[in-house]
């Protein structure tokens, strides 16, 4: 009977190859949280026992000195917004510049994704323009990776809920169906589903009309469900994924008077002026 092959990530393998003292130290750290290491980091090729109890480098130091893609991505995810944590305007501008550059230009997809995610959690309005540009620059990667980056940018823009990003989100939803492979069609549908969810953060009639249009014209179940969820978020009403039911709520004046959130349906003319 053949024995099971050794797994380098198993404790007994580590004990044989690193020595029992090192293995014990690793186990102690992982079980008690005394070291800033994860199991993936311990079992990675770059792991060194001598660094076991070494404090992690600050994110800015990593970004200024390291070319390791994984380390840089982790550092980008760890950056905090200076102004929200007692920092100065100068520090804020520096961090925004670092994140924006990574979101738009980094050669590593994971670094772009982490930078975009972090910008989505910032309150700084400058992040919005960077996120929009990150969406458009995602095309430098292969289609599947580009779709992931675009979707992350749309999620981040939805968190900001800034009217400057409304044009991009609606543009994605109004793009014609893709003529191409099944993969290309699915990539574009993933974008549209993400955009429909992001639109739930914009309590504007332009948003509700776009979402209503999805219920009227689209057949994809996931996209229709995303549109319904966003309409529910905007209006506070719970209705089925049905165009007629939502059309009545949004356009019938009597039904609108009974709606719990009367402020969501703004005058379309006013909205048109705001969206320019």
For each predicted feature, which ranges?
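Amphipathic alpha-helical scaffolding segments comprising HEAT/armadillo-like alpha-solenoid repeats
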Residues: 49-63, 85-104, 113, 124-140, ...
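Conserved hydrophobic register position within alpha-solenoid helical repeats
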Residues: 75, 115, 150-153, 195, ...
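Sec-dependent bacterial lipoprotein signal peptides
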Residues: 1-38
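Bacterial Sec signal peptide processing site at the extreme N-terminus
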Residues: 29-54
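Short inter-helical turns and helix N-cap capping residues of alpha-solenoid HEAT/ARM repeat scaffolds
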Residues: 67-68, 107-108, 138-139, 145-146, ...
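Terminal, low-structured helical/coil segments at or just beyond the last alpha-helical repeat
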Residues: 236-276
